[in-house]
Amino acid sequence: MHRAQAKVILDSISPEGIRLTTVQVRFWRPMLPELNTHRAISKNAGSSRARPSKAIIDQVRNDPWGPIHWGKNQAGMQAHDELTGWRKWACQQVWKIGAKSAAAVSWALWRLGAHKQIANRPLETYTYVDDLVTATDWANFFALRLHEDAQHEMYDVAKAIKE
């Protein structure tokens, strides 16, 4: 699956010596609520309602986003162990079937005349979001998200921003 991508848009230091960094980030959309828990970071994410349905349907059909770590079910919030062999492969195939199914549902809604704010929703699990994030203090974010207990996909977002 896809890895998070980040690009520094603006990095400046005020006369008082405060550094302000703005980063454009593209990442797996289900990680957006995780990023939004960090109140010290200003965020402006792209909306599913702003993207044409056909464009998202085509992207999900041909190039779905999803997990980069196929964690094995275990107690707790962390999936440190990863599935292997045929189980991992089977999960990846099921994920692709889910993406095709979501694309079919969205296509039907779109063709029936539903607005993209409705037609695009089934696709969100299988697509990306573009977000513009700005902060003066990234320490807490990196301490939590570049940690071994962070969800792998959120770790990937933090790593892309830090690099």
Locations of the language-model features?
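A conserved ligand/cofactor-binding region detector
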Residues: 1-163
